[in-house]
């Protein structure tokens, strides 16, 4: 029975990290598309838009890093 719990833990970690990565990739893709739309409409605002783009991209990318940290904690500390 212990082996089944460890296997379920591995699956849970894989799903958690995988879904977080997919969500971040979709979010950054949408964000990049909107940045390009904004830059095409208002070329004068590109420096301001670029700064905001990188800040929000960092925040969107932080969620999968937290999920990876929690997944590694679950994988090595709990099992």
Swiss-Prot record:
One of its GO terms (molecular function) is lipid binding. It is a multi-pass membrane protein. The chain crosses the membrane at residues 11-31, 53-73. Keywords: ATP synthesis, Cell membrane, CF(0), Hydrogen ion transport, Ion transport, Lipid-binding, Membrane, Transmembrane, Transmembrane helix, Transport. The record marks 61 as: Reversibly protonated during proton transport. PROSITE patterns: ATPASE_C. It is found in: Cell membrane. GO terms for cellular component: plasma membrane; proton-transporting ATP synthase complex; proton-transporting two-sector ATPase complex, proton-transporting domain. Its main location: membrane. Belongs to the ATPase C chain family. F(1)F(0) ATP synthase produces ATP from ADP in the presence of a proton or sodium gradient. F-type ATPases consist of two structural domains, F(1) containing the extramembraneous catalytic core and F(0) containing the membrane proton channel, linked together by a central stalk and a peripheral stalk. During catalysis, ATP synthesis in the catalytic domain of F(1) is coupled via a rotary mechanism of the central stalk subunits to proton translocation. Key component of the F(0) channel; it plays a direct role in translocation across the membrane. A homomeric c-ring of between 10-14 subunits forms the central stalk rotor element with the F(1) delta and epsilon subunits. F-type ATPases have 2 components, F(1) - the catalytic core - and F(0) - the membrane proton channel. F(1) has five subunits: alpha(3), beta(3), gamma(1), delta(1), epsilon(1). F(0) has three main subunits: a(1), b(2) and c(10-14). The alpha and beta chains form an alternating ring which encloses part of the gamma chain. F(1) is attached to F(0) by a central stalk formed by the gamma and epsilon chains, while a peripheral stalk is formed by the delta and b chains. This is ATP synthase subunit c. It comes from Buchnera aphidicola subsp. Acyrthosiphon pisum (strain APS) (Acyrthosiphon pisum symbiotic bacterium). The lineage of its organism: Bacteria, Pseudomonadati, Pseudomonadota, Gammaproteobacteria, Enterobacterales.
């Amino acid at each position: 029975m212990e082996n089944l719990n460890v296997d379920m833990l591995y699956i849970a970690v894989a799903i958690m990290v995988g879904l977080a990565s997919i969500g971040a990739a979709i979010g950054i893709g949408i964000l990049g598309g909107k940045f390009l739309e904004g830059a095409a409409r208002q070329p004068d605002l590109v420096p301001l838009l670029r700064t905001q783009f990188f800040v929000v991209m960092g925040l969107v990318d932080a969620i999968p890093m937290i999920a990876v940290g929690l997944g590694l904690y679950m994988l090595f500390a709990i099992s």
